[in-house]
Protein backbone atom coordinates (compact mmCIF):
# COMPACT_ATOMS: atom_id res chain seq x y z
CA UNK A 1 0.00 0.00 0.00
CA UNK A 2 1.13 3.56 -0.69
CA UNK A 3 -0.07 7.15 -0.93
CA UNK A 4 1.25 10.13 -2.87
CA UNK A 5 0.55 13.46 -1.20
CA UNK A 6 0.78 16.57 -3.37
CA UNK A 7 1.09 19.82 -1.44
CA UNK A 8 3.28 20.84 1.50
CA UNK A 9 1.56 23.90 2.93
CA UNK A 10 -0.33 24.05 6.21
CA UNK A 11 -2.91 21.43 5.28
CA UNK A 12 -0.23 19.26 3.69
CA UNK A 13 1.78 19.45 6.92
CA UNK A 14 -1.10 17.98 8.94
CA UNK A 15 -2.06 15.45 6.26
CA UNK A 16 1.50 14.10 6.22
CA UNK A 17 1.70 13.82 10.02
CA UNK A 18 -1.65 12.04 10.21
CA UNK A 19 -0.73 9.76 7.32
CA UNK A 20 2.49 8.86 9.13
CA UNK A 21 0.55 8.08 12.31
CA UNK A 22 -1.60 5.69 10.26
CA UNK A 23 0.97 4.26 7.85
CA UNK A 24 0.23 0.75 9.08
CA UNK A 25 -2.89 1.08 6.89
CA UNK A 26 -1.81 3.68 4.31
CA UNK A 27 1.64 2.22 3.62
CA UNK A 28 4.54 4.10 2.05
CA UNK A 29 4.22 7.90 1.95
CA UNK A 30 5.63 10.24 -0.69
CA UNK A 31 5.20 13.99 -0.18
CA UNK A 32 5.57 16.11 -3.32
CA UNK A 33 5.65 19.87 -3.86
CA UNK A 34 7.14 22.41 -6.23
CA UNK A 35 9.56 23.21 -3.37
CA UNK A 36 10.99 19.91 -2.17
CA UNK A 37 12.54 21.63 0.85
CA UNK A 38 9.05 22.16 2.28
CA UNK A 39 8.43 18.41 2.04
CA UNK A 40 11.72 17.68 3.75
CA UNK A 41 10.82 20.08 6.57
CA UNK A 42 7.59 18.17 7.16
CA UNK A 43 9.48 14.88 7.24
CA UNK A 44 11.86 16.34 9.82
CA UNK A 45 8.88 17.34 11.97
CA UNK A 46 7.33 13.87 11.66
CA UNK A 47 10.57 12.29 12.77
CA UNK A 48 11.01 14.80 15.60
CA UNK A 49 7.53 14.01 16.93
CA UNK A 50 8.03 10.24 16.45
CA UNK A 51 4.83 10.22 14.41
CA UNK A 52 5.90 7.49 11.96
CA UNK A 53 3.93 4.53 13.30
CA UNK A 54 5.60 1.81 11.19
CA UNK A 55 9.26 2.65 10.70
CA UNK A 56 9.62 -0.03 8.02
CA UNK A 57 7.44 2.01 5.64
CA UNK A 58 8.93 4.64 3.31
CA UNK A 59 8.61 8.38 3.96
CA UNK A 60 10.07 10.33 1.05
CA UNK A 61 10.06 13.77 -0.58
CA UNK A 62 9.79 14.61 -4.28
CA UNK A 63 9.66 17.78 -6.35
CA UNK A 64 6.79 18.24 -8.80
CA UNK A 65 4.97 21.01 -10.63
CA UNK A 66 1.31 20.34 -9.83
CA UNK A 67 0.22 22.37 -12.89
CA UNK A 68 2.07 20.00 -15.25
CA UNK A 69 -0.04 16.93 -15.99
CA UNK A 70 2.79 15.05 -17.72
CA UNK A 71 5.10 15.55 -14.74
CA UNK A 72 2.36 14.42 -12.38
CA UNK A 73 1.68 11.28 -14.42
CA UNK A 74 5.39 10.46 -14.45
CA UNK A 75 5.60 10.86 -10.67
CA UNK A 76 2.48 8.77 -10.08
CA UNK A 77 3.88 5.98 -12.24
CA UNK A 78 7.20 6.17 -10.38
CA UNK A 79 5.63 6.08 -6.90
CA UNK A 80 2.77 3.68 -7.81
CA UNK A 81 0.41 4.84 -5.05
CA UNK A 82 -3.03 3.40 -4.37
CA UNK A 83 -4.33 6.90 -3.65
CA UNK A 84 -3.22 10.43 -4.52
CA UNK A 85 -4.09 12.95 -1.79
CA UNK A 86 -4.30 16.49 -3.15
CA UNK A 87 -3.37 18.84 -0.30
CA UNK A 88 -2.59 21.71 -2.66
CA UNK A 89 -4.56 24.88 -3.49
CA UNK A 90 -7.86 24.57 -5.40
CA UNK A 91 -6.43 25.63 -8.76
CA UNK A 92 -4.33 22.45 -9.08
CA UNK A 93 -7.30 20.11 -8.65
CA UNK A 94 -8.01 19.65 -12.33
CA UNK A 95 -4.44 18.89 -13.38
CA UNK A 96 -4.08 16.35 -10.56
CA UNK A 97 -7.45 14.75 -11.36
CA UNK A 98 -6.48 14.45 -15.01
CA UNK A 99 -3.13 12.90 -14.06
CA UNK A 100 -4.90 10.40 -11.80
CA UNK A 101 -7.29 9.52 -14.61
CA UNK A 102 -4.45 8.98 -17.07
CA UNK A 103 -2.47 6.91 -14.56
CA UNK A 104 -5.60 5.07 -13.32
CA UNK A 105 -5.02 5.90 -9.66
CA UNK A 106 -7.67 7.02 -7.14
CA UNK A 107 -7.90 10.64 -6.00
CA UNK A 108 -8.90 12.66 -2.91
CA UNK A 109 -8.97 16.42 -2.33
CA UNK A 110 -10.16 18.88 0.33
CA UNK A 111 -11.81 21.70 -1.67
CA UNK A 112 -13.56 22.49 -4.93
CA UNK A 113 -11.43 23.14 -8.03
CA UNK A 114 -12.50 26.72 -8.71
CA UNK A 115 -12.09 30.08 -7.04
CA UNK A 116 -15.69 30.81 -6.06
CA UNK A 117 -14.93 34.53 -5.90
CA UNK A 118 -13.41 35.08 -9.33
CA UNK A 119 -15.36 37.22 -11.76
CA UNK A 120 -18.27 35.33 -13.25
CA UNK A 121 -17.79 32.23 -11.10
CA UNK A 122 -20.89 31.13 -9.28
CA UNK A 123 -21.61 28.43 -6.73
CA UNK A 124 -24.20 26.67 -8.97
CA UNK A 125 -21.41 25.78 -11.43
CA UNK A 126 -18.72 25.15 -8.80
CA UNK A 127 -18.36 21.40 -9.27
CA UNK A 128 -19.08 21.16 -13.00
CA UNK A 129 -15.46 20.50 -14.01
CA UNK A 130 -14.86 17.84 -11.40
CA UNK A 131 -18.24 16.18 -11.80
CA UNK A 132 -17.33 15.87 -15.48
CA UNK A 133 -14.93 13.10 -14.40
CA UNK A 134 -17.63 10.85 -12.93
CA UNK A 135 -17.94 8.53 -15.92
CA UNK A 136 -14.20 8.71 -16.68
CA UNK A 137 -13.26 7.56 -13.18
CA UNK A 138 -15.91 4.85 -13.22
CA UNK A 139 -14.68 3.53 -16.57
CA UNK A 140 -11.06 3.67 -15.35
CA UNK A 141 -12.01 1.67 -12.25
CA UNK A 142 -10.84 4.34 -9.80
CA UNK A 143 -12.37 6.38 -6.97
CA UNK A 144 -12.53 10.16 -6.60
CA UNK A 145 -13.45 11.68 -3.22
CA UNK A 146 -14.12 15.42 -3.35
CA UNK A 147 -13.99 17.99 -0.57
CA UNK A 148 -12.68 15.78 2.23
CA UNK A 149 -11.65 18.58 4.60
CA UNK A 150 -13.81 19.95 7.39
CA UNK A 151 -15.80 22.60 5.54
CA UNK A 152 -16.26 21.28 2.96
CA UNK A 153 -16.06 17.72 4.20
CA UNK A 154 -17.00 16.82 7.75
CA UNK A 155 -19.88 19.31 7.76
CA UNK A 156 -21.31 17.41 4.79
CA UNK A 157 -20.87 14.11 6.64
CA UNK A 158 -22.70 15.68 9.58
CA UNK A 159 -25.56 16.59 7.23
CA UNK A 160 -25.63 13.04 5.83
CA UNK A 161 -25.66 11.70 9.39
CA UNK A 162 -28.60 13.96 10.22
CA UNK A 163 -30.51 12.71 7.19
CA UNK A 164 -29.76 9.07 8.02
CA UNK A 165 -30.38 9.12 11.77
CA UNK A 166 -31.95 12.31 13.11
CA UNK A 167 -34.57 13.65 10.68
CA UNK A 168 -37.41 12.53 8.46
CA UNK A 169 -37.57 15.91 6.71
CA UNK A 170 -34.96 18.67 6.40
CA UNK A 171 -35.99 22.34 6.35
CA UNK A 172 -32.71 24.24 6.71
CA UNK A 173 -28.98 23.50 6.81
CA UNK A 174 -26.61 26.16 8.11
CA UNK A 175 -22.88 25.45 8.15
CA UNK A 176 -21.36 27.43 11.03
CA UNK A 177 -17.63 28.19 11.32
CA UNK A 178 -15.82 30.28 13.92
CA UNK A 179 -12.21 30.45 15.03
CA UNK A 180 -12.24 31.74 18.61
CA UNK A 181 -8.50 31.31 18.96
CA UNK A 182 -5.81 33.97 19.28
CA UNK A 183 -2.52 33.97 17.35
CA UNK A 184 -1.30 37.25 18.81
CA UNK A 185 -1.01 39.07 15.47
CA UNK A 186 -2.90 42.22 14.52
CA UNK A 187 -3.80 40.68 11.17
CA UNK A 188 -2.97 37.29 9.68
CA UNK A 189 -4.67 34.52 7.74
CA UNK A 190 -4.81 30.95 9.01
CA UNK A 191 -4.21 29.41 5.60
CA UNK A 192 -2.86 30.63 2.27
CA UNK A 193 -3.48 34.42 2.22
CA UNK A 194 -4.24 34.46 -1.50
CA UNK A 195 -6.92 31.78 -1.19
CA UNK A 196 -8.32 33.30 1.99
CA UNK A 197 -8.53 36.90 0.75
CA UNK A 198 -10.21 35.89 -2.50
CA UNK A 199 -12.66 33.65 -0.69
CA UNK A 200 -14.01 36.21 1.73
CA UNK A 201 -14.52 39.11 -0.68
CA UNK A 202 -16.79 37.41 -3.19
CA UNK A 203 -20.57 37.50 -3.29
CA UNK A 204 -22.39 34.96 -1.17
CA UNK A 205 -24.59 32.33 -2.77
CA UNK A 206 -27.18 30.35 -0.84
CA UNK A 207 -30.05 28.04 -1.74
CA UNK A 208 -33.57 29.01 -0.72
CA UNK A 209 -37.00 27.82 -1.80
CA UNK A 210 -35.80 26.09 -4.94
CA UNK A 211 -33.51 28.78 -6.31
CA UNK A 212 -30.06 30.29 -5.87
CA UNK A 213 -29.79 33.67 -4.14
CA UNK A 214 -26.78 35.98 -4.60
CA UNK A 215 -25.89 38.80 -2.19
CA UNK A 216 -22.78 40.95 -1.56
CA UNK A 217 -20.20 39.65 0.89
CA UNK A 218 -20.81 40.40 4.56
CA UNK A 219 -24.34 41.65 3.85
CA UNK A 220 -26.13 38.84 5.75
CA UNK A 221 -25.22 38.31 9.40
CA UNK A 222 -26.54 36.35 12.33
CA UNK A 223 -25.35 35.78 15.88
CA UNK A 224 -24.90 32.21 17.06
CA UNK A 225 -23.99 30.67 20.40
CA UNK A 226 -21.12 28.30 19.66
CA UNK A 227 -20.50 25.51 22.19
CA UNK A 228 -17.46 26.32 24.36
CA UNK A 229 -16.74 29.45 22.26
CA UNK A 230 -19.63 31.74 23.13
CA UNK A 231 -21.66 34.08 20.94
CA UNK A 232 -20.14 35.23 17.64
CA UNK A 233 -21.27 37.17 14.59
CA UNK A 234 -21.14 35.06 11.44
CA UNK A 235 -21.53 36.21 7.84
CA UNK A 236 -23.02 34.47 4.81
CA UNK A 237 -20.34 33.34 2.32
CA UNK A 238 -20.03 31.40 -0.91
CA UNK A 239 -18.67 27.96 -0.09
CA UNK A 240 -18.19 24.58 -1.75
CA UNK A 241 -20.52 22.45 0.34
CA UNK A 242 -23.56 24.65 -0.27
CA UNK A 243 -23.51 23.38 -3.86
CA UNK A 244 -22.92 19.71 -3.05
CA UNK A 245 -25.50 19.68 -0.26
CA UNK A 246 -28.03 21.25 -2.61
CA UNK A 247 -27.30 18.48 -5.11
CA UNK A 248 -27.70 15.57 -2.71
CA UNK A 249 -29.83 16.69 0.28
CA UNK A 250 -33.35 18.13 -0.18
CA UNK A 251 -33.71 21.26 1.97
CA UNK A 252 -35.58 24.54 1.76
CA UNK A 253 -32.52 26.65 2.59
CA UNK A 254 -28.78 25.84 2.66
CA UNK A 255 -26.25 28.48 3.68
CA UNK A 256 -22.64 28.80 4.88
CA UNK A 257 -21.64 31.20 7.65
CA UNK A 258 -18.18 32.23 8.87
CA UNK A 259 -17.22 34.29 11.89
CA UNK A 260 -15.14 37.46 11.57
CA UNK A 261 -14.19 39.85 14.34
CA UNK A 262 -14.72 43.58 13.90
CA UNK A 263 -10.95 44.24 13.83
CA UNK A 264 -10.43 41.65 11.10
CA UNK A 265 -13.19 43.17 8.97
CA UNK A 266 -11.80 46.67 9.45
CA UNK A 267 -8.40 45.59 8.13
CA UNK A 268 -10.04 43.66 5.31
CA UNK A 269 -12.22 46.57 4.21
CA UNK A 270 -9.30 49.02 4.11
CA UNK A 271 -7.12 46.63 2.09
CA UNK A 272 -9.96 45.94 -0.34
CA UNK A 273 -10.81 49.62 -0.75
CA UNK A 274 -7.23 50.61 -1.65
CA UNK A 275 -6.84 47.69 -4.06
CA UNK A 276 -4.45 45.46 -2.09
CA UNK A 277 -6.73 42.45 -2.51
CA UNK A 278 -6.72 42.60 -6.31
CA UNK A 279 -5.20 39.62 -8.16
CA UNK A 280 -4.91 41.70 -11.35
CA UNK A 281 -1.41 42.70 -12.57
CA UNK A 282 -0.31 46.25 -11.83
CA UNK A 283 2.62 48.07 -13.49
CA UNK A 284 4.79 50.17 -11.16
CA UNK A 285 6.56 53.40 -12.15
CA UNK A 286 9.80 51.50 -12.93
CA UNK A 287 8.02 49.01 -15.18
CA UNK A 288 7.88 46.20 -12.64
CA UNK A 289 4.65 44.21 -12.89
CA UNK A 290 3.16 42.97 -9.62
CA UNK A 291 -0.11 41.58 -8.36
CA UNK A 292 -1.20 43.51 -5.26
CA UNK A 293 -2.53 40.35 -3.63
CA UNK A 294 0.86 38.65 -4.11
CA UNK A 295 2.56 41.63 -2.47
CA UNK A 296 0.17 41.41 0.47
CA UNK A 297 0.83 37.68 0.75
CA UNK A 298 4.56 38.37 0.97
CA UNK A 299 3.99 40.92 3.75
CA UNK A 300 1.66 38.83 5.89
CA UNK A 301 2.92 36.17 8.32
CA UNK A 302 3.34 32.69 6.89
CA UNK A 303 0.33 30.73 8.24
CA UNK A 304 2.68 27.94 9.33
CA UNK A 305 4.46 30.44 11.61
CA UNK A 306 1.31 31.09 13.63
CA UNK A 307 1.13 27.67 15.29
CA UNK A 308 3.54 28.17 18.23
CA UNK A 309 1.70 30.12 20.90
CA UNK A 310 -1.73 29.90 19.19
CA UNK A 311 -4.37 29.46 21.90
CA UNK A 312 -8.11 28.88 22.06
CA UNK A 313 -10.70 26.81 20.25
CA UNK A 314 -12.41 26.56 16.91
CA UNK A 315 -16.00 25.46 16.49
CA UNK A 316 -17.30 24.20 13.15
CA UNK A 317 -20.56 22.39 12.67
CA UNK A 318 -23.79 21.81 10.81
CA UNK A 319 -27.01 23.27 12.18
CA UNK A 320 -29.93 21.26 10.84
CA UNK A 321 -33.61 21.97 11.36
CA UNK A 322 -36.57 19.90 10.25
CA UNK A 323 -38.97 17.24 11.47
CA UNK A 324 -38.61 13.87 13.19
CA UNK A 325 -41.69 11.73 13.90
CA UNK A 326 -43.89 14.69 13.03
CA UNK A 327 -42.22 17.03 15.53
CA UNK A 328 -39.99 20.04 14.88
CA UNK A 329 -36.34 19.38 15.66
CA UNK A 330 -33.16 21.47 15.66
CA UNK A 331 -29.66 20.05 16.18
CA UNK A 332 -26.12 21.36 15.92
CA UNK A 333 -23.54 18.69 15.07
CA UNK A 334 -20.10 20.11 15.73
CA UNK A 335 -16.45 19.80 16.66
CA UNK A 336 -14.25 21.92 18.91
CA UNK A 337 -10.57 21.87 18.01
CA UNK A 338 -7.88 23.22 20.34
CA UNK A 339 -4.94 25.09 18.80
CA UNK A 340 -2.56 24.02 21.56
CA UNK A 341 -3.56 20.36 21.29
CA UNK A 342 -3.04 20.50 17.52
CA UNK A 343 0.43 21.96 17.98
CA UNK A 344 1.39 19.34 20.53
CA UNK A 345 0.27 16.60 18.14
CA UNK A 346 1.65 17.79 14.78
CA UNK A 347 3.33 21.17 15.36
CA UNK A 348 0.58 23.12 13.62
CA UNK A 349 -2.54 25.16 14.39
CA UNK A 350 -6.13 23.95 14.52
CA UNK A 351 -7.30 25.48 11.22
CA UNK A 352 -5.02 23.25 9.17
CA UNK A 353 -5.59 20.43 11.66
CA UNK A 354 -9.34 20.43 11.05
CA UNK A 355 -8.70 19.99 7.32
CA UNK A 356 -5.87 17.46 7.50
CA UNK A 357 -7.47 15.08 10.00
CA UNK A 358 -10.64 14.55 7.88
CA UNK A 359 -8.57 13.97 4.73
CA UNK A 360 -6.76 11.06 6.38
CA UNK A 361 -10.00 9.83 7.97
CA UNK A 362 -11.48 9.68 4.46
CA UNK A 363 -8.34 8.02 3.08
CA UNK A 364 -8.67 5.30 5.72
CA UNK A 365 -12.26 4.64 4.60
CA UNK A 366 -10.95 4.20 1.07
CA UNK A 367 -8.20 1.80 2.09
CA UNK A 368 -10.60 -0.21 4.26
CA UNK A 369 -13.04 -0.56 1.38
CA UNK A 370 -15.82 1.50 3.01
CA UNK A 371 -15.56 4.37 0.53
CA UNK A 372 -14.11 2.69 -2.52
CA UNK A 373 -16.85 2.63 -5.17
CA UNK A 374 -15.74 3.55 -8.67
CA UNK A 375 -16.53 7.06 -9.84
CA UNK A 376 -16.42 10.56 -8.32
CA UNK A 377 -18.22 11.28 -5.05
CA UNK A 378 -18.88 14.16 -2.70
CA UNK A 379 -18.94 13.50 1.01
CA UNK A 380 -22.76 13.76 1.25
CA UNK A 381 -23.05 10.67 -0.98
CA UNK A 382 -20.99 8.40 1.26
CA UNK A 383 -21.99 6.43 4.37
CA UNK A 384 -21.33 8.79 7.30
CA UNK A 385 -21.13 6.11 9.98
CA UNK A 386 -17.67 4.56 9.41
CA UNK A 387 -16.16 8.01 8.90
CA UNK A 388 -17.60 9.41 12.12
CA UNK A 389 -16.63 6.26 14.01
CA UNK A 390 -13.02 6.72 12.86
CA UNK A 391 -12.50 10.48 13.10
CA UNK A 392 -12.13 10.76 16.92
CA UNK A 393 -9.25 8.28 16.90
CA UNK A 394 -7.48 10.41 14.25
CA UNK A 395 -7.78 13.56 16.34
CA UNK A 396 -11.22 15.22 16.12
CA UNK A 397 -14.25 14.31 18.19
CA UNK A 398 -17.83 15.39 17.46
CA UNK A 399 -21.03 16.08 19.36
CA UNK A 400 -24.75 16.50 18.77
CA UNK A 401 -26.41 19.40 20.58
CA UNK A 402 -30.20 19.70 20.71
CA UNK A 403 -31.41 23.26 20.14
CA UNK A 404 -34.78 24.94 20.44
CA UNK A 405 -36.43 24.84 16.98
CA UNK A 406 -36.92 28.22 15.33
CA UNK A 407 -35.82 30.28 12.38
CA UNK A 408 -32.52 32.15 12.83
CA UNK A 409 -32.64 35.95 13.02
CA UNK A 410 -30.73 37.00 9.90
CA UNK A 411 -29.65 40.65 9.76
CA UNK A 412 -29.43 42.22 6.31
CA UNK A 413 -26.57 44.73 6.29
CA UNK A 414 -25.63 47.42 3.78
Swiss-Prot record:
Superkingdom of origin: Bacteria
User: Thermal dependence of activity in this record?
Assistant: Optimum temperature is 37 degrees Celsius.
Q: Which UniProt keywords apply?
A: NADP, Oxidoreductase, Polyamine biosynthesis
Q: Which reaction does it catalyse?
A: carboxynorspermidine + NADP(+) + H2O = L-aspartate 4-semialdehyde + propane-1,3-diamine + NADPH + H(+); carboxyspermidine + NADP(+) + H2O = L-aspartate 4-semialdehyde + putrescine + NADPH + H(+)
**According to the UniProt record, what class of enzyme is this?**
oxidoreductase
Q: Name one GO molecular function term.
A: carboxynorspermidine dehydrogenase activity
- How does activity track with pH? Optimum pH is 7.25-7.5.
What are the EC numbers? 1.5.1.43
Activity modulation comment: Activated by dithiothreitol and inhibited by SH-reactive compounds.
GO BP field? polyamine biosynthetic process
Briefly state the protein's biological role.
Involved in norspermidine biosynthesis. Catalyzes the synthesis of carboxynorspermidine from L-aspartate 4-semialdehyde and 1,3-diaminopropane. Is also slightly active with putrescine as a substrate.
Q: How does it assemble?
A: Homodimer.
Question: Which family is annotated?
Answer: Belongs to the saccharopine dehydrogenase family. Carboxynorspermidine synthase subfamily.
Protein name (record) = Carboxynorspermidine synthase
Q: To which species is this protein native?
A: Vibrio alginolyticus (strain ATCC 17749 / DSM 2171 / NBRC 15630 / NCIMB 1903 / NCTC 12160 / XII-53)
Amino acid sequence: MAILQIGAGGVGWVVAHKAAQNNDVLGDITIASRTVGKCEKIIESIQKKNNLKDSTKKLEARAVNADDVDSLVALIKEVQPDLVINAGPPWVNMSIMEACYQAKVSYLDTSVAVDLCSEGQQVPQAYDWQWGYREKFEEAGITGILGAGFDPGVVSVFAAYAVKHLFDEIDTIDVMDVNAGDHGKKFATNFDPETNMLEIQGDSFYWENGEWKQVPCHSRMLEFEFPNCGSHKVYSMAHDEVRSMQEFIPAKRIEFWMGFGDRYLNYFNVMRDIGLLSPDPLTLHDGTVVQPLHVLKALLPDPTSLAPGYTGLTCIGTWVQGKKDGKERSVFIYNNADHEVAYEDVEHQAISYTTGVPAITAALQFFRGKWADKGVFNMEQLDPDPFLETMPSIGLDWHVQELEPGQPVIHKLK
